[in-house]
Amino acid sequence: MGSKFHAFLYPWFGFGHMIPYLHLANKLAEKGHRVTFLAPKKAQKQLEPLNLFPNSIHFENVTLPHVDGLPVGAETTADLPNSSKRVLADAMDLLREQIEVKIRSLKPDLIFFDFVDWIPQMAKELGIKSVSYQIISAAFIAMFFAPRAELGSPPPGFPSSKVALRGHDANIYSLFANTRKFLFDRVTTGLKNCDVIAIRTCAEIEGNLCDFIERQCQRKVLLTGPMFLDPQGKSGKPLEDRWNNWLNGFEPSSVVYCAFGTHFFFEIDQFQELCLGMELTGLPFLVAVMPPRGSSTIQEALPEGFEERIKGRGIVWGGWVEQPLILSHPSIGCFVNHCGFGSMWESLVSDCQIVFIPQLVDQVLTTRLLTEELEVSVKVKRDEITGWFSKESLRDTVKSVMDKNSEIGNLVRRNHKKLKETLVSPGLLSSYADKFVDELENHIHSKN
């Protein structure tokens, strides 16, 4: 229709949610729409540098009320221990009156939310549309509809028998379901009561799962694509000389790059197992991880004699690296990662072999999808009881995809190449955002 709308955004107050919501805001603003982003004042200061359209995206501050257990000055999950996340949810619930006042004053056409399940009812009362915008994978959302006693099997009607939880993976899911039940239930309620569901994914990867969610919730499911990534990594910025010069010393597709994001911390024993596993591959490697728990530096946590043994062919780095640029270097042949959202997409649009060691429940499910359903990656085997991986299992998994004569290595290489060609085809991912915005406009003007 081409008419412009005004959207309110009310994400969960964790930066892992607020930042993707701001990427959404940037895309809406790029298309000429107005956005009001609801956030605490301290969070706004950290988000503002990511606001690419300050004339179209306006922050409205909300003040969290005091609730028992919420520390003075705490505004986001970064201010709280894991055990106190429910307290933040309780405080966000008490913002209803503040938000209602802002809606009546600013008159948006729709409001995006993820965990606050009373938004659909309030939106209906105020005559605006509600959109449950989920940044977690469709595979994870779909499992919300599995009976708790049957986590080892997919829900009835589930489109894949392979994206299921078994062994230690099911234990991770059960732990999440029990300790985060308050979020679990909120998301499910929001999905079933909103006007529209939107998910940060694409049909080429999770199309069947999105169709399943649509049937379960009886709500239209819109896909945004990854929303913020340049799939071909063409930023124009060169790789830092330190890494470029080091990588230039190796043959094409010979180096194993390993990273787990800036928010994950290994236990020291598992960190050392990771290092030893990389050493055992016999391949050159670059590991970029945070220092393990209880260690202030990477060096103090390394196995005894490790640095001397791997000198010249391996680096373990404890700081930030330019991951997309490293992955685009011709010497990189394999990417070992946790299947976090950013790393997953960066691996899929790279030319590297992909090895996953998922850490969180949504990463576990996405790994199963990519490894067992699409067969574009492999997963490191773990102990069924502890969930830990051994240095030998890491070595064997990496070598299985780096060996040119390996059957599994050639299978995932072929499948990954086909999927990558689809994902980076001109205009594919940007077309998701365009279609998403067009469909939002239609829903705003529909009478249902």
Curated annotation (Swiss-Prot):
Spell out the family assignment given in the record's similarity comment: Belongs to the UDP-glycosyltransferase family.
- Enumerate the residues binding UDP-alpha-D-glucose: 262, 321-323, 338-346, 360-363
Listed A to Z, the keywords are: Glycosyltransferase, Transferase
**What is the organism field in this record?**
Arabidopsis thaliana (Mouse-ear cress)
Record Pfam families: UDPGT (PF00201)
Protein EC: 2.4.1.-
Q: Which Gene3D superfamilies match?
A: Glycogen Phosphorylase B (3.40.50.2000)
Query: Protein biosynthesis as a keyword?
Result: no
From the broadest rank down, the organism's phylogenetic lineage runs:
Eukaryota, Viridiplantae, Streptophyta, Embryophyta, Tracheophyta
Whichever gene encodes this chain, its name is UGT79B4
InterPro entries this protein is in? UDP-glycosyltransf_plant, UDP_glucos_trans
Q: What is this protein called?
A: UDP-glycosyltransferase 79B4
User: Record's superkingdom?
Assistant: Eukaryota
Q: Name one GO molecular function term.
A: UDP-glucosyltransferase activity
